[in-house]
Amino acid sequence: MFTISGVVLITRPVYDEGSLNYCQSGAMNNGILLESVEGNKPRYSIGGAEPIGTINANAVLTAATYAEDVKFTDADPLNGTRVAICNGEDTQQEEMGFQGGALGYFAYDVGRRLEGYNDLGIEDWAIPDLAGSSYEIGVSADHQNDVIVLIAHASADGNDVFITSSRQLSMVAGPTCCASGDVEILRNKLHYYGVIPFSQDDCGFNRLKDYLGSGDMYQVNLGNRNVGAIVMTLFQGYNQLRLMNPGPYMVFLDEANIIMASPEIVLADEANDLNTRPIAGTLMRLNEQDEDGVNAACLGQHHKDRAEHMMIVDLVRNDLGRVGRFGSVNVQEIVGAENYSVVMHIVSRVTGSLNEAFEAMEIIRAGFPGGSITGAPKVRAMEIIEELEPQRRDGWGGSIGYIAYRGNIGYRIAIRTLFACNGQLFASSGAGLVGDSMEDGEYNETFEKMRALRSFFCAAVHMGKTPYLS
């Protein structure tokens, strides 16, 4: 154990992939976990506990607090986030992963406040537009070196704070506990409701085709919502989702009652290198590996999916261009197929170098919400989504991630995501519609994207009694 620039560090070997579960131990409150489980995953999984500042926003006002005092209120949700992270210290330690900052989520509906279009959707869930915290204790699991680094911020001159921080870290740095106990079979059933965009009765699909035919937009992503009852603790649900639908961007966000297994990063900034990996174009996976390979080749050549994907690549390239240095934005990988638990997607990678005139909030503003969850052109697609989808999207289609004190950011699109509210879970899935889309095919795509999450509701869950399963 040692201190550098007011930071207490403890390293431990990674005993297993669940070592970050300390965030939900009895001593930790309002924990958050951003975990990389499999696939094209980043180097670090990160978590936080013991929040020292919070950010919350509703449809009108954003409030940032620090040490329990309200420090800032504003109509702009990004300004509140800026205030929440400015109290932290930039430790400037290389190769240490996440060293403190703000972790949380921006709901899709923050986009309405940023763009100023009409509010038409029904607000049927009491979910904040924004919820996050800045953390006193952080953890980074380094997948490259197979170690966990636990971090607490403390004044190098303040012995009392140093001792307290050291004790806190030592307490959570012990051997990993694992879930155990009897198995209970949970037989929840999801049901669809409010599927107006794909309903013949409302002709929502036909209205959308009219918009596409008239040139209002070239593509729009419409979604279906699914609802089921909560029959387990949220962290039990996270552990089960982690087993059944592992992905590169897993999230457990206790404060906002969110669990996620997203495959898509909307934007990241590491040392002024911008990176985004848009996903658009979907095909169901088959059981045989050889058939997967054939389908992957077909997916990349399918004219509808390829056109859908290229529109989104162009859109996110323009988004990065708003904050990138002139001439630095490039498409590094294009139209590659990636396999996930039940589907394969077309994925590309767009990169750029940050224009140093901009900082984290401007990067988020430039790319929010993600193009693959909205459409092209983005603002017009968002207006049409507001008209055709009956309820607000709330968290679905927003972003979950972190803004580090040192300025690095990493945000994932909130798809393959479950939200808990009022004793229920809800999840949504969408499909990108273009001029030659067929209604049945697009509806089936939204249904198949939910396959892993539907299985989640009917799975066997370990009802353990370990501290983090409270």
Curated annotation (Swiss-Prot):
Pathway per the UniProt entry: Cofactor biosynthesis; tetrahydrofolate biosynthesis; 4-aminobenzoate from chorismate: step 1/2
Transmembrane segments: none
SUPFAM superfamilies membership: ADC synthase
Reactions accelerated catalytically: chorismate + L-glutamine = 4-amino-4-deoxychorismate + L-glutamate
Keyword vocabulary terms for this entry: Folate biosynthesis, Magnesium, Transferase
Cited PANTHER family: AMINOBENZOATE/ANTHRANILATE SYNTHASE (PTHR11236), AMINODEOXYCHORISMATE SYNTHASE COMPONENT 1 (PTHR11236:SF50)
Stated family: Belongs to the anthranilate synthase component I family.
Name the UniProt record assigns to this protein: Aminodeoxychorismate synthase component 1
